């Protein structure tokens, strides 16, 4: 397999906890019981209730929505890319979804390049050569470019309509991840590489992602086969994608990278140092630079509750002493 599933939405008629058991059966790299449903919250999009899908008691992987007369007995499971990265047995998920009345409603399939094999300009060139047109269609789908004057902000291309059954995104994933982790601007280009994958550093400028979002709208049906053979569905999204899948290397099956958690934590510490480092140094000059003084100041300034942002990012699940994302 060369592509990966980066978003999963399905509806179902069983209880949310039955759906949880089905998803647990497909998990890998983690003890299934560590993935659970959080407390009930007010629902969205017409559902009466919702519960977060939580890993290790803190990291949110998605949401399950349920209840409400207008939903006619349906519930909805929404799992982000972070959640999908923990699924190992997609074949079991495809096998057991029918047992809970499950139907796929949205599946995003992505192809990553980490070594600069594909660039933003390559995608633009392919579009202008008509390589995103469907067969027997005269015009290419609409293209939208999103970019700023700052190269490290990253560039994005949208192809097609957001509400249609097929919507394509092509973007500089490395820069996007650094922005999400709030990496200080000076650090983005100073580093020799970031561990977007475990054990393998890559330049953020070389990490590019191409992604197709398939939705069950306008009469389009998403078969369960997409869970076990995403490469073929990605290839069918555009002639350009077909050529990329043919030349791309097979994807290594490995645990998700903890890059975002490590980098988010390091960035938060850097921001804290810049904002409050001067205050802390002044207090040490005033009260004495000793271990005892530092301990008292830490206790005095430390909040009773951890940062909500770091909790939701899964930073509290990192091993003690983690310094680099691997």
Language-model regions, residue ranges each:
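Structured, helix-rich domain cores that form ligand/interaction pockets
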Residues: 1-263, 268-326
